[in-house]
Amino acid sequence: MKNLFILLFLTIFICIPVIGCASDVKEHDVDIDFSDLSMTMIQAEYQRILSNSEDYMGKTIKMNGTYYSFQIDEAGNIAHFVIIIPGDDCCQMGFEFKRGENYVYPADYPAQNAMIQVTGTLDKHEQFGAVYIYIDVDEFSVISE
C-alpha cells in the first residue's frame, strides 16, 4: 500500500508541472528570433547559421530588416531578401526568402528598402550550380514603407 501511495504521489507530482506548462506553448514557436537580439548576437547567430547550415534546416526563424529584391536571370525571376543593416553600415546580413507561388511581384511585395518582418522555416535550394539557404515564409508583414 505504501508503494502504491508513493507511485500515486510521484505521478501527480510529475504531471502537474507538465499540465501547467501546456498553456505556454505557442502556435508558431520561433527557434531563432533575430528581431529580439542585440547586433552582436545577430552577427554571431548569423555566422553560426552560415557555418553550420545543415544544423539549422527546418528551424523557424524570425527576422526584421530591409526588403530588397532584384532580377536573377533573363527569364525575369526575382529574388527577395530581408537584410539587416548594422548602425555603422558594415557587414550587412540577410537571407533570401520565398513566399510561395500565390504571391506575385511587384503587386504582393513592398517597395524597395521597406522595413519588413519575415517568419519562416530555413530551407535550401540549388541554383546556378550552388546551394543557397532561404527562409520559406509562414508569416510576412510590412513594418513601414
Language model feature labels by segment:
Residues 8-17:
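Bacterial N-terminal signal peptides
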Residues 1-5:
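Positively charged n-region of N-terminal signal peptides that target proteins for export
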Residues 6, 19-145:
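OB-fold and OB-like single-stranded nucleic-acid-recognition modules
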